[in-house]
Structure formats: structure tokens, C-alpha cells
């Protein structure tokens, strides 16, 4: 089961134009978002370390997201 709250995930799908959404669809998107978020986070940590920092900054996240 995904750790992200399901209600906001459902709103994301609704904002994309869906009228009805199954619980399985919400769970699947939540899982995909978590996996993508972890991948971006790992890359952002690498970028911060490469810059000689222990703190991950917003720019690290933005750069990591663009690279993936």
C-alpha cells in the first residue's frame, strides 16, 4: 500500500479530467508517484553531495527532476 494519502491523488486524477476513479487507480498512481519521488530524491542527494553539501535544496530537486 502506498504511503501517500489517497484523496489528494484522486484530486490529481480528477484535475486531469477523469469523472470517476477506481480505488485501484488511485493506489496505482500513488505508488508510481512514490517511486518517482524516491528516484528524484536519490538523484538530488547525489547532486547535493557533489556540491559539497549535506542539505538537499529545492534547486537539487528541480535539477534531478529535469534529468529524469
UniProtKB/Swiss-Prot annotation:
Subcellular location: Cytoplasm; Chromosome
Keywords: Chromosome, Cytoplasm, DNA-binding
One of the record's GO cellular component terms: chromosome
Positions in coiled-coil regions: none
Listed Pfam families: CBFD_NFYB_HMF (PF00808)
Chain residue ranges for the region called Interaction with DNA: 20-22, 54-57
Main location: cytoplasm
Keyword Cytoplasm annotated: yes
Residues under site feature: Interaction with DNA: 14
Source superkingdom: Archaea
GO molecular function per UniProt: DNA binding; protein heterodimerization activity
SUBUNIT field: Homodimer or heterodimer with HmtB. Dimers then assemble into higher oligomers, with the DNA wrapped around the protein core.
NCBIfam families, alphabetized: archaea_histone
Function: Binds and compacts DNA (95 to 150 base pairs) to form nucleosome-like structures that contain positive DNA supercoils.
Similarity comment: Belongs to the archaeal histone HMF family.
Protein name: DNA-binding protein HMt-1.1
Origin species: Methanothermobacter thermautotrophicus (strain ATCC 29096 / DSM 1053 / JCM 10044 / NBRC 100330 / Delta H)
Amino acid at each position: 500500500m502506498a504511503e501517500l494519502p489517497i484523496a489528494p491523488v484522486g484530486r490529481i486524477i480528477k484535475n486531469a479530467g477523469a469523472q470517476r476513479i477506481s480505488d485501484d487507480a488511485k493506489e496505482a498512481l500513488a505508488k508510481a508517484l512514490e517511486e518517482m519521488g524516491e528516484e528524484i530524491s536519490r538523484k538530488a542527494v547525489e547532486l547535493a553531495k557533489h556540491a559539497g553539501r549535506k542539505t538537499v535544496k529545492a534547486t537539487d530537486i528541480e535539477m534531478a527532476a529535469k534529468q529524469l
